[in-house]
Amino acid sequence: MEQIRPFSDNYLDRLRTVEEDDYNDWEGSSDTKTLYSSVSDSKIGHKKSFHKDGKGLFKTLRNFLSLKTNKVPKNRKFSLLKGSKCNNVEIKVFIRNNDKQSNVHNFKGKDSIHEAWSQYLIFDSMGLSPLIHISGEDKYKVLCLFSIWRRKLGKCSIFTVHDPDIQKKIKSILSYLWELSNTNDPPHVIVWHTAKGTNVMTMGPLGLKDEDLWNYANERSNLNGTT
C-alpha cells in the first residue's frame, strides 16, 4: 500500500501560486485554432499541439508542475482561477453514508474552487473519504486541476465522464500531464460511460497490469468527478 505524503500548513498557499515563468512560448493560429506548447522538459524536447480551449489551462498546469523544486513560488494566483476564467462551475463536496449524501457543502462561482478544495481537505484530514461532484461549463478544467492537487498528496483520481467532448479534453490534458510527471506518481483512471458500455482509459506506473489498475486506483481514490 502506498504511503500518503502529508501536506504542510502552507500547502494551499503553494497551490494558489505559480512561479514567474516564461509566458511567451505559446503560439496560436486563428485559422487552425491550434495551440502549440514549447515544452522545455528534456525528456520531451518537441512541440505538441493542443486544442485552443486549453490555452490558459495548459499554461497554468505547465507552471504548476514546475513547483516540484524547493523554490518559493511568487505570489501569483493561477490564471485559471482568476475571475471570469472559471466562473461557470458548481462544486459539491459531501460524504456518502449508506448510499446517502450527508454533510453537503455547495460552492459556486469564482471562489468555489479554493473553498471546495479547502472543505475537501478538512473532510479528508478527518478520514471521512469525501466525494466531489463538479458541474458547469468549466467543469473539465476544475476536474483536472483537482486531480493534479490530489497527485501532490500522493493520491490518484477516478473520473466518471459521460460527455464525449469533455472526454477528449480531459484525455489531452492528462496525457500532457503524464508526460511531465514522475512515473512513480499514482495513475489517473478515467471511466467513460457510453451507450455501448463502460470504457476505461488509464495512465499509470509502468508495470502495473491493466486488470489490476481499477482496484489499484479504487483503493487510493476518494474523488469522484462526475460530468
Curated annotation (Swiss-Prot):
GO cellular component annotations of the record: cell division site; cell tip
GO biological process, alphabetically ordered: proteasome-mediated ubiquitin-dependent protein catabolic process
Domain of life: Eukaryota
GO molecular function: ubiquitin-protein transferase inhibitor activity
Record protein name field: Uncharacterized protein C15F9.01c
Native organism: Schizosaccharomyces pombe (strain 972 / ATCC 24843)
Organism lineage: Eukaryota, Fungi, Dikarya, Ascomycota, Taphrinomycotina
